[in-house]
């Protein structure tokens, strides 16, 4: 009853209840005028061009006529489901169709669709519609690849000065990276008996396995020394004040060592090779003192394996990590920032030269810098835990010197 009252209220003037030819207008709950949803309108349409069927705002050419979305959908459903034989009209099939009355007589609306020229043969059945959608997706993917290839071709590559910088950074990395490309042949696996026993009665397995920790401390000093040697060989680093050099080295040391381990992740054995010589499993590294930091380094190794980084890209990543101007205590922040910008620009141009076929490769690679910075921050906190759990005599002096005073 309430519904009928609302229907009557929508036509306030009694004269408006009749067609121009004197026929009575029929009413339903949809007779209130609704604004069309604003959306994409093709450029070939004039502003507010009307639908040739109902005079609502048209959205484009549909089945050979300029129509609105509503009439397009009505015509498509009618043909696809073969509904028109069942349509009927109570008023001699001569209703006037507009945007207010279009839903009140399906037969007259369909007849008008045909009369204005909408083509039944252009309505696709289900199989053709699926094939068309597939073709559209294939074309869209093809265009995306073409645009990506075109944008890659138009990106700047390194200048002669940048090539020289890249060569020096790569040489610095290769000369300080233990075992080089022969690490798989040279590595030795840490025995399974070390560091893989579950730590019982300790919350979250937070106890440090001293045997595994002792094994790791044997390789930590040469690993740190190689990071220092790498930094000393870098252009611009030696020009910084000694105090800033020390701050930068302490800040990036764990990050660079983690990167060097991560790029030596082996999916077959599920190990990382530390310092180019010791292959360890996730639980061994975790129980040997690193805890959750172990998970972060292994996860990084897994994700980096898809990037197929070469020595130059690893070297430039290390240079970017080293020249981080937000390290606490720096006296020449601006100078360090300019150094990092120089390396970043050369790095980006080198990535353009390499033409990786991974979408958005450069920003994705930069996200790994963020991951490595997080690993460094987590390790600083983890180091405090190791100091509590492990006897002082197990800590090599250089290990203490680099990590003891880091901010947590």
Swiss-Prot record:
Native source species: Necturus maculosus
DNA-binding feature ranges: 48-125
Sequence ranges assigned to domain NR LBD in this UniProt record: 161-405
Descriptive protein name: Thyroid hormone receptor alpha
Binding sites annotated in the UniProt record for Zn(2+) 2: 89, 95, 105, 108
Binding site for Zn(2+) 1: 51, 54, 68, 71
Residues involved in 3,3',5-triiodo-L-thyronine binding: 226, 275
Subcellular location: Nucleus
GO annotation (BP), single: positive regulation of transcription by RNA polymerase II
InterPro entries (alphabetical): NHR-like_dom_sf, Nucl_hrmn_rcpt_lig-bd, Nuclear_hormone_rcpt_NR1, Nuclear_hrmn_rcpt, ThyrH_rcpt, Znf_hrmn_rcpt, Znf_NHR/GATA
PANTHER family: NUCLEAR HORMONE RECEPTOR (PTHR24082), THYROID HORMONE RECEPTOR ALPHA (PTHR24082:SF42)
Primary role: Nuclear hormone receptor that can act as a repressor or activator of transcription. High affinity receptor for thyroid hormones, including triiodothyronine and thyroxine.
GO CC term (a single one): RNA polymerase II transcription regulator complex
């Amino acid at each position: 009853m309430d519904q009928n009252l609302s229907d009557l209220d929508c036509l306030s003037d009694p004269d408006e209840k009749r067609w121009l030819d004197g026929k009575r207008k029929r009413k339903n709950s949809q007779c209130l005028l609704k604004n069309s949803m604003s959306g994409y309108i093709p450029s070939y349409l004039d502003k507010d061009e009307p639908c040739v069927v109902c005079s609502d705002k048209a959205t484009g050419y549909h089945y050979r006529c300029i129509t609105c979305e509503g009439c397009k959908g009505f015509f498509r459903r009618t043909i696809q489901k073969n509904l028109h034989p069942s349509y009927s009209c109570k008023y001699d099939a001569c209703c006037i169709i507009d945007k207010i009355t279009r839903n009140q007589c399906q037969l007259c609306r369909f007849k008008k669709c045909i009369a204005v020229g909408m083509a039944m043969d252009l309505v696709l059945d289900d199989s053709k519609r699926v094939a068309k959608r597939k073709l559209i997706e294939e074309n869209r993917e093809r265009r995306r690849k073409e645009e990506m290839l075109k944008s890659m071709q138009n990106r700047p590559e390194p200048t002669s000065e940048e090539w020289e910088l890249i060569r020096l950074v790569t040489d610095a990395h290769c000369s300080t990276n233990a075992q080089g490309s022969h690490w798989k042949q040279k590595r030795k696996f840490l025995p399974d008996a070390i560091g893989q026993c579950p730590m019982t009665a300790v919350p979250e397995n937070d106890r440090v396995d001293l045997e595994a920790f002792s094994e790791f401390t044997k390789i930590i000093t040469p690993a740190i020394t190689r990071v220092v040697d790498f930094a000393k060989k870098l252009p611009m680093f030696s020009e910084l004040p000694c105090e800033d050099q020390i701050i930068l080295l302490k800040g990036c040391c764990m990050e660079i060592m983690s990167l060097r381990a991560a790029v030596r992740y082996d999916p077959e054995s599920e190990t990382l090779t530390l310092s180019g010589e010791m292959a360890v499993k996730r639980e061994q590294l975790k129980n040997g003192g690193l805890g959750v930091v172990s998970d972060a380094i292994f996860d990084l190794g897994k994700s980096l394996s898809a990037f197929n980084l070469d020595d130059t890209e690893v070297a430039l990543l290390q240079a970017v990590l080293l020249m981080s101007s937000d390290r606490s205590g720096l006296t020449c922040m601006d100078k360090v920032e300019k150094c990092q910008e120089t390396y970043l620009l050369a790095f980006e141009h080198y990535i353009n030269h390499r033409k990786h076929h991974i979408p958005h490769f450069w920003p994705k690679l930069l996200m790994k810098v963020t991951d490595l910075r997080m690993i460094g921050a987590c390790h600083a906190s983890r180091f405090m835990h190791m100091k509590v759990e492990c006897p002082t005599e197990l800590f090599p002096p250089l290990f203490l010197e680099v990590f003891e005073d880091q901010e947590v």
